[in-house]
A protein has these predicted regions:
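Catalytic centers of hydrolytic enzymes
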Residues: 1-139
Length: 139
């Protein structure tokens, strides 16, 4: 993943967002077959985990995928899945090379982060909190 720092407790600035994510990547939305998506999660497991969507539940054992579901369902090899990721990863990583379709958006990822943090703060009395939700379990 591209996240390069943690966020300390206290006021969050735009500069903090750039420190958190200092790259000029944009969002790519791609479609790919389940068989190819599994290859991506094999890489996630080999690294011991990385940020994934809230609907994903991944159990890693000995740096291998032990179990994997998306929205409570196993990945179907022949089904087409739509995922959002970084244009950098689509351009450089083998596990994304066999995507079926691709749409790049012209907004930088750090702008998405900034907008998301503002949204969270606006809807939570100025507070942003985080918690573990069990997306990835390493045994």
């Amino acid at each position: 993943g591209g996240i390069r720092s943690t966020i300390a407790k206290g006021n969050l600035t735009v500069g903090d967002v750039f420190t958190l994510y200092p790259f000029d990547n944009v969002l790519s939305v791609i479609t790919m077959k389940g068989s190819e998506l599994k290859k991506f999660f094999d890489t996630v497991a080999a690294y011991g985990g990385m940020p994934v969507n809230a609907g994903v539940r991944l159990v890693i054992s000995n740096k291998k995928v032990k179990s994997l579901t998306i929205n409570g369902k196993a990945i179907n090899d022949s089904q087409t899945y739509t995922i959002a990721t970084l244009n950098y990863l689509v351009n450089t990583e083998d596990y994304f090379k066999n995507h079926l379709t691709r749409m790049d958006y012209s907004i930088y990822v750090w702008d998405y982060y900034t907008a998301y943090f503002r949204h969270l703060a606006k809807n939570n009395n100025g507070q942003i909190t985080a918690s573990k939700d069990g997306r990835i379990t390493v045994e």
